[in-house]
A protein has these predicted regions:
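Solvent-exposed soluble domains appended to multi-pass membrane proteins
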Residues: 1-235
Length: 235
């Protein structure tokens, strides 16, 4: 979520200047997603396949149900459609391959390769220690784009650096961006942590755009968020 859409927050500076610049200069909009606070895989499934989660069971994750069935050899997706016209198709994600059974799901959705955390040189983690930072994804995304010669590529890159949980204690000693306005100290600490993590993601976006531009190949970058954070937002 854009922190400026949270009407009670005040921030020392804009945490996502790259995003706001893109928002002002390129096509943007709101994406309706099927989950809140968790369930990234179901947003992915809807975006990649065009199938609505309302036709599945309550609490179901197709990655872990239909896509694991032996009688479901494949599911049509953006990846399979682009593959059919000659694209190389790749996934890059700085989390474990087996989370949400992505290692199985992506192959059935038409992706040629899946570079997960296990195949990366991870050297930096978020202040909570829970997740790798997203900066590693810049080089890994470019590597996926460079992996094929004389071929267009579709690369689906999934970030994890701004993922929850968001600690109620203050664990960033000197935050780049300070936050005030939440109902209590614990909530304020959570929001300050979240804001600084999406600031890091914004830096990743800027660095990715620079890296892609340096390649000198016509490229379209599309970004979307998976769900709102678990922060007690009601409207």
């Amino acid at each position: 979520i854009d922190p400026y859409d949270v009407n009670f927050l005040q921030m020392s500076e804009d945490p996502i200047p790259t995003f706001h610049s893109l928002e002002q200069n390129f096509t943007t909009g709101y994406l309706t997603v099927p989950v809140v606070g968790a369930g990234t895989a179901n947003t992915e499934f809807e975006v990649l396949t065009g199938m609505s989660m309302q036709y599945f069971g309550t609490g179901e994750y197709p990655y872990k149900t239909i896509l694991k069935q032996s009688d479901c050899p494949s599911v049509e997706s953006i990846a399979s459609d682009l593959s059919s016209i000659g694209y190389g198709t790749h996934v890059v994600h700085n989390n474990t391959a087996t989370f949400y059974s992505r290692n199985n799901a992506f192959s059935k959705m038409g992706f040629d390769t899946f570079t997960s955390k296990e195949l990366m040189n991870i050297t930096e983690y978020t202040p909570s220690g829970s997740w790798p930072t997203d900066k590693v994804l810049v080089n890994e995304t470019v590597k996926a784009m460079d992996a094929t010669e004389n071929q267009s590529d579709f690369v689906y890159t999934i970030t994890v650096g701004s993922h929850g949980d968001y600690p109620t204690e203050k664990i960033i000693e000197n935050p780049e961006i300070t936050v005030t306005g939440a109902a209590d100290e614990a909530s304020n600490n959570q929001w300050e942590y979240y804001v600084n993590m999406i600031h890091n993601t914004d830096n990743f976006i800027a660095n990715l755009i620079d890296a892609v531009n340096r390649r000198g190949e016509d490229t379209i970058i599309v970004m979307f968020g998976d769900h709102l954070p678990t922060m007690g937002l009601e409207d």
